[in-house]
């Protein structure tokens, strides 16, 4: 059997009430050129029972204690066979048409090593979209490179498995910014990206999510301090620290390609709508 185009790794711990929707968001895609891998960290809720309901759709899965989210993703990537890889949090969803859009973008730009798309945040309570992030339509190679401009949004990034094998695993010492560190590593190594003009990722906002920790003021300050320390660590480790010049060049490109105006329009038009009003979601949430 030929290797799939994409390997999707879901990391889960005690999200039995949500992982079913996450899995369904993958298996309901309009492109089946993928494999699904699930790494459960030894959940104590009904997660395993839910995962077993979808075993026929899963290439490989395991439930055992791990060392955290990054460790779980690395474990999943070690079993991946796809040409490209990505991750998905067990409480989020892959939005409709994502795999097709990513495949089209990467096929049109075979020299690219990774693709990045856009995302929305939605409230778990009533599925209202609370934020819509739309990046640049086009990112020319001259704007990319060491210390230049980068636009990457978490699990909206899909990169070559060969790049992962070359750069090594995700840094498991980071709690909040492990994705930022990895994208910095890719850029500093000279790998180029192609933009996907599509909403790829639905980020579910709920009280148990990692970003929900930004609620209480004291807790927010502590988390900000942790994130600032992690960003300083990333700069020292990777050397990635874009100058103001390249940031302004990136903003200028966004004005020229129209994506800055699209982002403003989308934030006005989409935010406040129900997720199911804007996207053709055929599965449970």
Predicted regions and their residues:
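Conserved nucleotide-sugar donor-binding catalytic segment
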Residues: 136-223
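Conserved donor NDP-sugar-binding/catalytic core segment of glycosyltransferases
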Residues: 97-130
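N-proximal low-complexity "stem/linker" segments adjacent to membrane-targeting elements
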Residues: 1-27
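Short aromatic/hydrophobic "clamp" motif used to bind/position activated sugar donors
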Residues: 85
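Acidic helix N-cap motif at the loop->helix transition within catalytic regions
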Residues: 17-20, 45-53, 93, 97
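A conserved acidic beta->alpha catalytic loop
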Residues: 25, 32, 40-49, 89
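Glycine-rich, basic loop-to-helix element that forms the pyrophosphate-binding segment
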Residues: 64-80
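Cell-envelope/extracellular polymer assembly enzymes that use nucleotide-activated donors
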Residues: 4-7, 35, 181
